[in-house]
Amino acid sequence: MASGKEIRGKIKSVENTKKITKAMEMVAASKMRKAQERMHAARPYSDKIRNIAANLSQANPEYTHPFLVKSDVSKTVGFIIVTTDKGLCGGMNTNSLRIVTTKLRELEAQGKKVETVAIGNKGLGFLNRIGARVVSHAVQIGDTPHLDKLIGPVKVMLDAYQDGKLDAVYVVYTKFINTMKQEPMMEQLLPLAADALKADADSLAWDYIYEPDAQTVIDELLIRYVEALIFQSVAENLASEQSARMVAMKSASDNAGSVIGELKLVYNKTRQAAITKELSEIVAGAAAV
């Protein structure tokens, strides 16, 4: 059995760890609230752009933007994979990358090639380890994502799709459901879902006056719409990250408390055994005199 001094050292070590995890839990909780606010604030923007794009597409059926055209010529699929820059957020990244691995194997079995864009250090490291083709990446996004940091890597994928080098583009991220639940998602980014746009357009009974013309507006608008979808994915992923980290650190703090309780029990038993032994020796010595 370990000595009392060794057990006290272990208790002190676990208590120090608990202080760290508790502080990280509080920081994550604060960041989570801010991330949720940004996530909710971004939704009306992307929703409004989708409504206008839907109206434009329906009002000008003679023009079809490349983002709405399905293709199966290049036999190459693009992925924009959104992960975190840091760890200590439970199995969040693992769950997202697991569905990426499954999809990559499926496409490989179909004889298709894959090109990827990594947003976040964890995803970039994973893609490099498995030998995937990474055409661009963005890391160190920080707690406040900016479109300026994302637009470069995203544009690589958009240009490749417009040039016919990609048949489809998917985005992978972790969707924020609530504080305790986050789900890994894989959504088709391109070609845009024409049915969804049509459904939005059917609910609108008005039209705009477009300057200089509808085609120019829709060309620019659909690019902005796709960028908004990517930004929304990053915002959702960030909110999920802080929620997962808060839960993970709370679990770590609770586990540390349990370990401290068990160690204190062992320490008390050891101390009691030592006292009993000393008393026995004193009594035996007194009896021998």
UniProtKB/Swiss-Prot annotation:
Membrane topology is:
Peripheral membrane protein
Q: Where in the cell is it found?
A: Cell inner membrane
Query: Is the keyword Ribonucleoprotein assigned to this protein?
Result: no
Gene Ontology MF terms: ATP binding; proton-transporting ATP synthase activity, rotational mechanism
Q: SUPFAM superfamilies this protein is in?
A: ATP synthase (F1-ATPase), gamma subunit
Q: Where is the signal peptide?
A: none
Keyword Electron transport in annotation: no
Function of the protein: Produces ATP from ADP in the presence of a proton gradient across the membrane. The gamma chain is believed to be important in regulating ATPase activity and the flow of protons through the CF(0) complex.
Stated name of the protein: ATP synthase gamma chain
Species in which this protein is naturally found = Herminiimonas arsenicoxydans
UniProt lists the gene as: atpG
